[in-house]
Amino acid sequence: METRLAVMSIIVRSKESVNAINELLHENGEYIIGRMGIPYRERNINLISVALDAPQDKISAISGKIGNLENVEVKTAFA
């Protein structure tokens, strides 16, 4: 199956959601090229950037599951 490159940008407004995001990313680790998390303490949010190489439907499914979490926003850009 053909794969696509994508960058997923995640804004987490609640620390309670971080564990769920990490679990979802761990479950899909085979598709992750790299990730970076930045805690922004002044605003009490976390910024996460994830680079993926996966089938487009898999990337969309991961993005959808993360986006359905409470206090989480996600945007995905495809190369």
What are the roles of these predicted feature ranges?
Residues M1-A79:
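Long, contiguous binding/interaction regions
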